[in-house]
Amino acid sequence: MKTQVEFRSSKFPPYEGEQEQINPGLWGKRLDEYFVRKLSEKGIKTEEIIAEDWGWYIPVQNEGFRLAICCGHQDGDDDEFVCFTDPSTPVVKKFFKKIDATAQLTRLTEAMQQILSADPEIKEVVWKGPT
């Protein structure tokens, strides 16, 4: 299952001071706000965006296990971004059991694919499996 996407867009520049919230040279809060808005239009509910040292974390409402989209500017040109799901594989280990996350990940990645492909300002979209 492909749960990581890289793309280019000048649509998501950093906010002033954003790099102090995470790390120098990294940003993506505008991208996460965009995903929150677009996911909501598709009936996928999210929670408050969280700053991480590598970028931004969007918790997705889900029962049974943690589900999220992680996004940020990728090292390189100012228009390079990467997003991946958490979890990155369809099997979630929780305590002593395994949970099949295929349905939830499929719904989330399909929504992400639709959002990215529908926007003409987002280019060079490449999906990859977990690394």
Predicted regions and their residues:
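N-terminal low-complexity, intrinsically disordered segments
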Residues: M1-V36, S40, I44
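Acidic, low-complexity intrinsically disordered regions
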Residues: N23, I50-E52, K123
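Short linear interaction motif-like sites in intrinsically disordered regions of transcription factors
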Residues: G28, G55-Y57, K128
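Short, intrinsically disordered low-complexity segments
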Residues: E33-L67
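A domain-level signal for the structural core that forms small-molecule/cofactor-binding pockets
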Residues: V36, K93-F96, P130-T131
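Amphipathic protein-protein interaction modules
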Residues: W54-L108
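Intrinsically disordered, low-complexity regulatory regions enriched in serine/threonine/proline
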Residues: A101-T131
